[in-house]
Amino acid sequence: MHHSGKGAALVLGIGNILWADEGFGVRAVEALHQAYEFPAEVKLMDGGTQGLYLLPLVQDADILVIFDAIDYGLPAGTLKVVDDHDVPSYLGVKKMSLHQTGFQEVLALSAITGRYPAKVRLIGVQPLDLDTYGGSLTEPVRSQMEPSLAVAIRFLMEQGFPSRRRISGCVPESLCPPSVNLAHYEAGILVGGR
């Protein structure tokens, strides 16, 4: 599979899976990776809470897609899409965790250095629960997983990066360690531990 556009795309899931809905971004990019194949120029990444460590990756991207739990002040589970230079202001609306401050800085430094992606899309979902340590995604947030993936797929296609559903049984290596795989995490299965 190849793309007809130029450059490279980075699809980032940011957030902290240990705090319930705060893990939406990471869970979304992992679900996208498990279900779809993209051209080699598309990098899917669990950005977690890495903050400034993501700067070189963002600077090298022509197209940036971000999945994150964002407190828009809307009903829980509301899916909201924000584009381009409006993205940093939405990441700073109401900070829910330190990763949002760190990622705002990544975008600001990318702009200051003149290496800001040509197109940026934030796919955010209003969280319900950010206080349950060890909690998983709540139903209102989980219900927006497929619609959020569809938004990303359509956007990437519009930018010249087509996707293809993975063939059943052809599951790629996970973006995150097996111990934090959503199914294992929710079942309390410790992979590789004692």
Task: Please tell me what each predicted stretch does.
Residues 33, 59, 86, 101, ...:
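A generic membrane alpha-helix/interface feature
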Residues 20, 94, 98, 136-140, ...:
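Short alpha-helix boundary/capping segments
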Residues 103-190:
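Phosphate-binding/catalytic loops
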